[in-house]
């Protein structure tokens, strides 16, 4: 019985030791657009834990955030992104046209899909004096819309197209 426990203990320690020898430290850079900062902080932490449990590798994901267009330009100009999560397919296409990613990136998933979600926030004055509650509220008399520069912000491009 003691021999059996000794053998099992030796095998277990060998497995743990071997796994730690082969485990890698992996650093990745996710270049993304501004509103995703908090999302990716949480997602990256969860993914790192998952990956370490699955493989034993320790993953550190660094983040770079800015306007989608500016981030695309940074990648085109040489920032070494491992992951690119931008607001518009247009920005990803610009990176692909410069040879930084596969030009056929859109065909990677079924139906040329790029699964993603985004949250829209209405920022109003204290007390919401104009009672902005939904999209229809935005066409009320006296309501003004402020949006970022569509030349550098993917969200602003969507705003421009929706107007």
Segment roles from a protein language model:
Residues 1-9:
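Bacterial N-terminal signal peptides that target proteins for export
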Residues 157-163:
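Extracytoplasmic/periplasmic substrate-binding proteins
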Residues 18-20:
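N-terminal signal peptide c-region/cleavage motif recognized by signal peptidases
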Residues 9-10, 60:
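Intrinsically disordered, low-complexity, compositionally biased regions/tails
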Residues 11-12, 90:
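Short, linear, compositionally biased motifs with a strong N-terminal bias
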Residues 6, 14-15:
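Alpha-helical hydrophobic membrane-insertion segments
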Residues 24-153:
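N-terminal segment of the mature folded domain
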